Amino acid sequence: MMSDTLRAVLLGIIEGVTEFLPVSSTGHLLLAERFFGLGEDGFWKSFAILIQLGAILAIVALYFFKLSRVAIGALSNADDRRFIIGVLIAFLPAVIIGLIAGKYIKALLFDPWVVCFSLIVGGAILLWVDQIDLKPREHDATRYPLLMYLWIGVAQCLAMIPGVSRSGATIVAAMLLGGDKRSAAEFSFFLAIPTMVGAFVYDFYKSRAEMTSDHLGLVAIGFVVSFITAMIVVKAFLGYVTRHGFVLFAWWRVIVGTLGLIALALGK
């Protein structure tokens, strides 16, 4: 039987690797739970949300100077203030939909079959967007038009369906709205900060009574592992998509989703 420490490490790796790639971290965690017995009880389901903070802090660390410049500049620079407003505008749709329908979405759609179909459909869309001849007009994620931020935020709501991918939905939306591949990926990272911090705070509040000192130790392990893994993955990801696009990730989604459907059909 797998030890809790090893389980925490494996889930931390899955979270750190998949959170900022357009492949759906939630989908991969649900499939890991279904096929490998990772995270089957209440604590481990909350664990998957709690360790997202490690991945988020990796983004804060990687973009610390840029984010600090924007935060300080917002006091005197209209463009920096507009970017902060843009992130909040993009964040708002997820807050509204999450509060209204989050409980029902989890009850109805958090299912391995839904994950697999979402992975395949999302992979096909990502492949299509990567291959069509888009003409990027926006090359700086901190200078997108405000309406563009809003539509990216609306697209992010699709990621409440497990398997869709928060980063995938926001990257595709940004590219279709005129962003280049690198800036689309970067804004997806920036938008993840309030979105995932909000999810962390909400889930921690709900599960605080169930937490023991042992649980906190496991969360700390998963947190550190997801932080380190995300740091490595994000740096490599930006360089890769700038040169090669998203084809690799699109096919990964299709393959994982197809294998998952086969396994489910066979009763695995």
Swiss-Prot record:
It catalyses: di-trans,octa-cis-undecaprenyl diphosphate + H2O = di-trans,octa-cis-undecaprenyl phosphate + phosphate + H(+). GO terms for molecular function: undecaprenyl-diphosphatase activity. Its EC number is 3.6.1.27. This is Undecaprenyl-diphosphatase. InterPro entries: UppP (IPR003824). It comes from Bradyrhizobium sp. (strain BTAi1 / ATCC BAA-1182). The keyword DNA-binding does not apply. It is an enzyme of class 3 (hydrolase). It is found in: Cell inner membrane. Keywords: Antibiotic resistance, Cell inner membrane, Cell membrane, Cell shape, Cell wall biogenesis/degradation, Hydrolase, Membrane, Peptidoglycan synthesis, Transmembrane, Transmembrane helix. Catalyzes the dephosphorylation of undecaprenyl diphosphate (UPP). Confers resistance to bacitracin. The keyword Transmembrane applies. The chain crosses the membrane at residues 47-67, 83-103, 109-129, 144-164, 184-204, 218-238, 246-266. It is a multi-pass membrane protein. PANTHER family: UNDECAPRENYL-DIPHOSPHATASE. Signal peptide: none annotated. Bacitracin is thought to be involved in the inhibition of peptidoglycan synthesis by sequestering undecaprenyl diphosphate, thereby reducing the pool of lipid carrier available. GO terms for cellular component: plasma membrane. GO terms for biological process: cell wall organization; peptidoglycan biosynthetic process; regulation of cell shape; response to antibiotic. NCBIfam families: PRK00281.1-2, PRK00281.1-4, undec_PP_bacA. Pfam families: BacA.
